Each structure stands twice: as C-alpha cells, then as structure tokens.
Regions:
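Acyl-donor-binding surface of acyltransferase catalytic domains
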Residues: 1-60, 165-172
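Short amphipathic alpha-helix that is part of the acyltransferase structural core
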Residues: 44, 48-95
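Short, Lys/Arg-enriched charge-dense amphipathic segments
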Residues: 49-56, 111, 128-137
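Short, functional N-terminal and low-complexity linear motifs
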Residues: 60-63, 117-121
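Short loop/turn motifs at secondary-structure junctions and domain boundaries
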Residues: 98-103
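A short acidic/small-residue loop/turn micro-motif
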Residues: 122-126
Length: 172
C-alpha cells in the first residue's frame, strides 16, 4: 500500500473537481467539492490482484452503471456516508449530484434485495484502471471494499494480468 498518488487518481480527482466548473455553481456544491478533495488527499492506493480468490457479495447482475439522475442520487447518498457530520454529508450530496456522465470515469452501484448498498468510481486511462471511492453498506472497511472492487473488476473484465495497472483506492 502506498501514500503516493498514482497519476490516474489525479485524473479522477480533476474530473470530479471539474464537475462544478459551470457558469452558476451553487455554494453548496463548491463546499462539497472542497470537502471531497480534502478527503481525496488522504487516500492510499494499492494494486488490485484480480487472481485473489474471495467470496463476492455481489453477482454481476447486481452491479449497475450509473447512467441516469436517480441512480446518481443513490450513488451520492451512499458516498456521503463516508463523512461523519450530517452537514458535510449534505454538501457531498450536492456536489456529487452535479456529475455529468463522461470519460474517463464511470460510477457504479451495487444492489442487494433491490436496495443500493455499494458504490464506486471506475477511472480508465490507456495504461491503468482505478477503482475508487468504494463504499459498502455505509462503511469503507478494506475487506468489503476489496470484495466489491473485485466484483466490479470481474463484471468489466478487468484483470491484473493485462498490460494495464489496476489500482484500488483505500480509505485509511
């Protein structure tokens, strides 16, 4: 595990920060961006070995690409649980619900019994993949996050034996 931020993580953070670079951003979305970027600086990174055999909590059919606003709201609500204070959670929701679907990032949700219980961002470049911002059941413990990340990697056919690096962002 490393504190060094891989270039792909910088690309993801820049992409997210630019989501509120609009003509009339709300003060709440700008405050949410500031909170998000502060937390992003504290993250650690590890390479993700897709050859690891572990029990997955998510079948491929339970993982969905976020591609319309209602799913974005669900994604944002789950992500906001990474912050402790309710007022910070509200700012994060305001920030993340501004996301416009575009490369190089895609948002994913994991469902259980019809309820959203996991979320992550997948960033893709020519030479790397990053699975980040992983939250499972309002928690970010490494074991559950790794399982969800591996489930996403499996769904997207990302594997560590390819010529691309596969990174996982980990909350310390």
């Amino acid at each position: 595990m490393t504190d060094t931020i891989p270039h792909i993580a910088k690309i993801k953070n820049q992409w997210l920060a630019e989501q509120v670079d609009v003509q009339y951003p709300t003060k709440e979305s700008l405050a949410g961006r500031k909170l998000y970027l502060a937390k992003a600086e504290q993250q650690h990174f590890t390479t993700l070995d897709t050859d690891i055999q572990c029990e997955s909590n998510f079948a491929q059919e339970d993982i969905f690409l976020v591609d319309f606003h209602r799913l974005t709201v669900m994604f944002s609500l789950l992500q906001s649980q990474r912050w402790d204070k309710p007022e910070e959670q509200e700012l994060i929701v305001e920030f993340l619900t501004q996301i416009i679907y575009s490369e190089p990032c895609q948002l994913y949700l994991g469902f259980s019994n019809g309820e959203p219980v996991a979320a992550a961002v997948v960033t893709t470049t020519d030479d790397a993949f990053l699975i980040s911002d992983v939250v499972v059941n309002q928690a970010s413990d490494i074991e559950n996050c790794t399982r969800f990340a591996l489930s996403i990697a499996n769904k997207l056919s990302l594997n560590s034996s390819s010529s691309c690096e596969l990174y996982l962002e980990v909350t310390p």
